Design a protein with these regions (language model features):
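Short acidic-glycine-tyrosine-enriched beta hairpin
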Residues: 81-96
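Short histidine-centered beta-strand/loop micro-motifs
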Residues: 37-38, 56-62, 103-105
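A short hydrophobic beta-strand segment most commonly corresponding to one strand
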Residues: 93, 107-125
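Glycine- and acidic-residue-biased ligand/ion/polar-headgroup-sensing regions
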Residues: 64-66, 70-75, 80
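A short, N-terminal "cap"/entry segment at the start of jelly-roll beta-barrel domains
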Residues: 1-43, 128-147
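Conserved short histidine dyad/triad with adjacent acidic residue
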Residues: 32, 47-62, 96
Length: 147
């Protein structure tokens, strides 16, 4: 199977562009495309997420590890207790139980490919206590309040 990529629209033939999540999690201006969903003997899911300028993914963590490659644009990723600038071509390993969030720069998209196991645990949102711990770091507090 070959899915042709349209570089103008950042879409693949035969792949629907979906709402990022439908579980009530907080996010802003993010879409999801599922490019591969566990066919044959590879039980994984390969997805493309895109945040519009100023958009961001859910601040979350989970038990499973996942791999991300920035495919378009630039922005920041909150990974554990650090904020990193990222851009197209950067590869990010997100270990299980690591708090993370992707954010597009104002005026720029950020699109990323993400590989996860098809069978995985559910996302966990941060508790008020976990949020307080994060906000005790002034850089992270500023990052979280900047959107």
């Amino acid at each position: 199977m070959i899915r042709k990529f349209d570089a103008k629209d950042f879409k693949w033939d035969g792949v629907d562009t979906l709402v990022y999540k439908q579980d009530g999690s907080p996010f802003k201006d993010v879409t999801r495309q599922v490019l591969y969903d566990g066919a044959f003997d590879i039980p994984c899911q390969f997805r493309y997420f895109e945040c519009l300028p100023g958009g961001y993914s859910t601040l979350e963590y989970h038990e499973h590890t996942h791999m991300v490659m920035i495919f378009r644009g630039k922005g920041q990723v909150l990974l554990g207790d650090e904020i990193h600038d990222v851009e197209a071509g950067d590869f990010i390993e997100i270990p299980g139980k690591t708090i993370h969030q992707f954010r597009a720069n104002k005026g720029d998209y950020i699109g990323f490919l993400c590989l996860v196991n098809q069978d995985r645990d559910k996302v966990k949102l941060l508790t008020p206590q976990e949020m307080d711990t994060l906000r005790s770091n002034p850089k992270i507090k500023e990052f979280l309040e900047s959107c």
